[in-house]
């Protein structure tokens, strides 16, 4: 509510401490202007996306604005000030997933207390559940590196396909695509290597549905 209060903002800057600026009920021009006032004083700023409506209905939460602020102010810390009803804490969880680095929400020991703050605040149970969820999300997110995990080894061995004979192949025959198919498990020649098999010569008779191995073929001399 004080984002347009230039004297107050400049007074806060005199403490030379980072300022956390909530953007509730403001537009981008007002945010830009307040940021410029703070920048002119040489003080760092964190911006919190916020909807100043108690409680904030889900359709007004507009959490994508967190990403919008990150794009508009790439050098700032961006967070979220939440006024939705706690429920399962989905708003804060989503804000965290969208990159919010600061999360702020009212806290109370009793949601039934009178006043305009307690009924939409989180309590200790909400906070504990939120913490557990974030810890699990951190585990689920993992890292940006794609590699085959040890836990996937059985799947790689048994769910992948191997080349097999689609029909009986007599010794001396040149291998063509029509002679081949692929089936589980993946213990034999991978279909990824089919080009190395095509054109080879069968050393011995190969029975229909037989798993192919490299020693079954010789290079064509053509």
Model-derived regions: residue spans:
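Catalytic cores and adjacent flexible loops of soluble metabolic enzymes
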Residues: 1-222
